[in-house]
């Protein structure tokens, strides 16, 4: 009798778990789908739901259907452009419509996706408040200042 109750309880729990289980779909995204490079170093999602990919060959925005790629000197998207194509990290600002982009040897970029403009932050030896180096490897939000970032 105890075995019957235990097996009935087990089967009941198993069927409940199957009912609550969610199916996940996996979609392959690569060069064939429009990604600029298959070597993705960082991914973030902005407040509008778009995915942003940092690669060894540009910044990529995915809208669920297609990619838009931002390259250095790609001025049709804006009047300044991203400062480098070899990227280390992307971070979506949680308070502002900004994607922060860490580059290899070309500083930090802020892309305002509402205004579609880039702002570059680079090392300037004459400015003690500028970045200490143009090789930015990581970005993290500050827990002490709502608008602050830690960069390394």
Which residue stretches match the model-derived regions?
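Carboxylate-rich, polar loop motifs that coordinate divalent cations or form catalytic acidic clusters
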Residues: 1-152
